[in-house]
Amino acid sequence: MHPFASYVLRSYYKATGWNEDNLYANLTRSSNAILDFTVPRGLHLTVSKSPNALFKTTYSMTAMPSLHGSVGYIFTSCDLDVKSSGNVRFKNMIERFKVYDQPRRPEPKEEEWLAGEQVQKRDYLLYGRFYLPTGRLDALYSTRLSPTVQALVAAISDPPSNIPSELRDRNGDPSNIMLNLQHDVGKWCTEYTWSAEDGMWGVRVLHNFGRLGMSDAVEDGGGGKGDRTVKVKRVDEEDAVEGGLKGRVSMGAELYFSAKERSAGVSTGIRFTTLPDATPPSFQVPSSSSSSSNPVSPSTSQPPTTITALFNPMLGHMSGAYTARVSRDLALSSRFDFNVYSYESEWTMGAEWWLRRSLTPRPSEDGEIHPPTPPPFPPPVEDVQGVVKARASTNNDVSLMWEGRLRNMLVSLGVVSDFSSRSKPIKAIGLEVSYFSSE
């Protein structure tokens, strides 16, 4: 489940028109959602509030195994349509398998005029979080320098403390500041990174083959207007060929080095993904005359599929993953990792199963069972009420997690087990409850 701060950050990217998916760091995002999901540890509670469209607050507390908490504040320069935990789209709060929309060049903001003069307004986001009792402080500043360039500054301040080590965050990082510059033109996306702690410089590049998408591309699961999709040939669409999968290919690489640590690293990756969740191919879109008599479902052409491969020549690590949605509510993923130097390997399998409300007919007053009458318009409330994720690997690690909505709260419950240990088969179990309001 996404933390409230991550949900606000994604809403900020969406409001400013920035495509966070067109990054080399997110090349394996679809398979990671199923194979690398994070199971909560202990008891974790989060309460957040949006007093207005620009300012947000969030409070979190972990009661088990140790007691600690944090306070966070978020401020944005633009209005964000942040929902409450009771009415937010459930899939927007879950890291899930998804065929992401085709990349496109970011568009500039609309011009604003005041008293006959153009107002130069730059979007930005400020985020800060203070942890208790460790005294650690996290900060993030994100701003758009131009329609295609975004800058991020992240800082961590972790002062020395006399607090016992068991009360401190296990993943705590020393004080550091990192600069990140992203340049996205749709077909290419480049990242430049600098870290002050170890003096590390890095660059990442992602190239998308084929033509760019349209600016009015339809989101996953969303419906666009008919006049925008009927008889429109998608720009990256190829001619119909029997057999095989149709989609797009993306390739990328990263290079980083540190003069202070006298170390360097390099990796490369490739991704193939189909496009059934975006604008359907033109031959699958029914015309205005035949749409009512012979509708065609775009999802029946090919299953949503993502295939990725990564290679790190310096560490000798190779990884290949295959992820596909085999039905409306079930997605499966498999990944094989291999090291060419040590010959160590690992095979990981995972599944994602969505739970929906049952629409069973109810008996009427006369005792007869009548089928439910479909409403004249689609209901505004989605029928998804939860998701179950499972993961197993050849290292005998098995993880199971359920995420759902109970009344106005988002709940995550998970367990991690190790079948190779008879003395302690359950490694971790946790419960996370999140509530946030925008009223």
Swiss-Prot record:
Low complexity composition bias: residue spans: 280-305
InterPro entries named among the record's database cross-references: Mdm10
Coiled coil start-end: none
Subcellular localization, as worded in the UniProt entry: Mitochondrion outer membrane
GO biological process, one term: mitochondrial outer membrane translocase complex assembly
One GO term describing the cellular component: ERMES complex
Membrane topology: Multi-pass membrane protein
Key words of the record: Membrane, Mitochondrion, Mitochondrion outer membrane, Transmembrane, Transmembrane beta strand
Signal peptide from the UniProt entry: none
Region Disordered, annotated ranges: 275-305
Presence of keyword Mitochondrion: yes
Primary site of residence: mitochondrion
UniProt keyword Transmembrane present: yes
Protein family according to the UniProt entry: Belongs to the MDM10 family.
Function: Component of the ERMES/MDM complex, which serves as a molecular tether to connect the endoplasmic reticulum and mitochondria. Components of this complex are involved in the control of mitochondrial shape and protein biogenesis and may function in phospholipid exchange. MDM10 is involved in the late assembly steps of the general translocase of the mitochondrial outer membrane (TOM complex). Functions in the TOM40-specific route of the assembly of outer membrane beta-barrel proteins, including the association of TOM40 with the receptor TOM22 and small TOM proteins.
Subunit structure: Component of the ER-mitochondria encounter structure (ERMES) or MDM complex, composed of MMM1, MDM10, MDM12 and MDM34. Associates with the mitochondrial outer membrane sorting assembly machinery SAM(core) complex.
Domain notes: Lacks alpha-helical transmembrane segments, suggesting that it resides in the membrane via beta-sheet conformations similar to those predicted for other outer membrane proteins and porin.
HAMAP family per record: Mdm10 (MF_03102)
Name of the protein described by the UniProt record: Mitochondrial distribution and morphology protein 10
The organism's taxonomic lineage, starting at the top: Eukaryota, Fungi, Dikarya, Basidiomycota, Agaricomycotina
Chain's gene name: MDM10
